[in-house]
Amino acid sequence: MRKLTSFTFVALTALAVSACSNSSKEIEQGTEQELYAKGQTYLQDGDYSQAVRYLEAVKNRFPAANYSEQTQLDLIYAYYKSQDYTKTLVAAERFLQQYPNSPNVDYVIYMAGLTNFASGENFFQDFFGVDRATRENTAMKAAFANFQTLVDHFPNSTYAQDALARMAYIKAALARHELAIAKFYMKRNAYVAVANRVVGMLQQYPDTQATLEALPLMKEAYEKMNLPDLAKQTETLIQANKDKKFSDVEKPKDVELNKPKA
């Protein structure tokens, strides 16, 4: 039985090596049309890692060919679906530089936003419950900037409505993040840092529940620093907003992405 198992393993390994060898040969020698068609087949099958192999071969071997723009769009999609966010952003930036007048610019900006959004979500999941309050979520801020660019320059885009919803969610999430940092500093008696954080929240995220909840922290920080006038001003602000409550902003549902045509 052991011999049979061993022979079976050797046979399967040989098949895998043979298939890999054939695939590599195909990528090295295939025509532009053959490689692109193969990449499309893998995309449709949801085998994004294989799709990337063939599409990258098209891009690298035939950089000025007929499929160049479409290949780059497909790669952005395949990288994103593979959760290779670094390559997604690099590909998106390259596309915007090479095809600034493409009718798919809004799609590429949107994909950059989704990519940064996904990276930022990973950060938040890692952050809350873990003592890492001094870290900044640059990915979520980048996502907000991407979506802002999209709605400013392409207000009628198919992706504008979802971008707006994600901006609202990001704003609320970043405000909660700032509140967590303010609490972190308060526990360490870093009162100047607390006050500065909440002032920043008032400037950047005034219409969020987290900012309202941060006001008492700012008041306490001023009191601890023996700044009664600022503490009194903060109390006035608290009283002016005591009946106000902002509704929770739900995370937008994942969208059904379709590959655009160049």
Q: Which residue stretches match the model-derived regions?
A:
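Acidic, polar-rich low-complexity tracts and alpha-helical solenoid repeat scaffolds
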Residues: 2-6, 16-262
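Conserved glycine-rich beta-strand-loop-beta hairpin in the small C-terminal domain of fold type I
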Residues: 9
